[in-house]
């Protein structure tokens, strides 16, 4: 399997295993159940606690992630034993030409919403110590870049929350004298 580097062209990889099929009655097709599973990791991005408002995201990239691998199907109905191996070919995965506003509440998903075709479908892999980074660019020329840690597991969704050290949030506190009782 090879993941597309243009996120809008990526496809999810679904697999299904029937387990052992028993042909016990001659002339009668055996029953075969299939339980489908996602073999990739879905990646989304959301508003973090300190992301500047009034900005527009123009580009999101995942850099240095492995793009190729061999997927071995399970021979069990529950999918145990399926695995990824021989991962190779570090590439940059790009989502360009965006106009996604940051004027949303914390935790609001920015990419990967139903119908937007902005979900990154990545091969499951170890991230810690592999120099895999996320790069986000805004129309004003500012950017966020961060090194990823942990791992991506098959059949899961990872949502990364975007925050900045210094945001454009302005806080105003107004006080009033307490009323006498």
Give short role names for the model-derived ranges.
Residues 127-139:
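A short, solvent-exposed beta-strand micro-motif common in secreted/extracellular proteins
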Residues 143-151:
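Edge beta-strands of extracellular beta-sandwich domains
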